[in-house]
């Protein structure tokens, strides 16, 4: 993408006005999954992700974090997950034992606005509800 189409900061990273990022109960954000090397990439903007599911691409964590506003969205319950993403949100937002490698969502812990339904927020504690 040409610089004239997208602002670039002094570190050579693109600057998006908004990054709306999905999160999984396993802590993946975009297609940055736990215990995979893509999570630690620091220079590339976009990464290929080759997994058992169809191959995909994802923004790197530095690009996600370089957005002017970051919103992480988590919602939905199912028969398989009757409490939705509650455990994942607890681990992403308050669990001290998690690392970027084991739970990529912690990389956005202090920089994002977290939007979730009641089920996803149910394990966060009163200070978050």
Feature roles, as predicted:
Residues 1-129:
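Conserved phosphate- and dinucleotide-binding cores of soluble alpha/beta proteins
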């Amino acid at each position: 993408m040409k610089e004239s189409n997208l602002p670039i900061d002094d570190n050579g990273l693109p600057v998006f006005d908004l990054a709306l990022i999905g999160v999984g109960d396993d802590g993946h954000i975009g297609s940055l999954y736990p215990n995979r090397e893509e999570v630690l990439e620091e220079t590339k903007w976009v990464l290929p992700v080759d997994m058992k599911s169809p191959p995909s691409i994802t923004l790197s964590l530095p690009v996600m974090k370089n957005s002017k506003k970051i919103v992480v969205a988590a919602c939905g319950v199912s028969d398989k997950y009757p409490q939705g993403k509650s455990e994942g949100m607890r681990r992403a937002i308050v669990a001290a034992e998690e690392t970027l490698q084991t739970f990529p969502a912690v990389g956005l812990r202090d920089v994002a606005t977290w939007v979730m339904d009641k089920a996803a927020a149910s394990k966060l504690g009163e200070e978050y509800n």
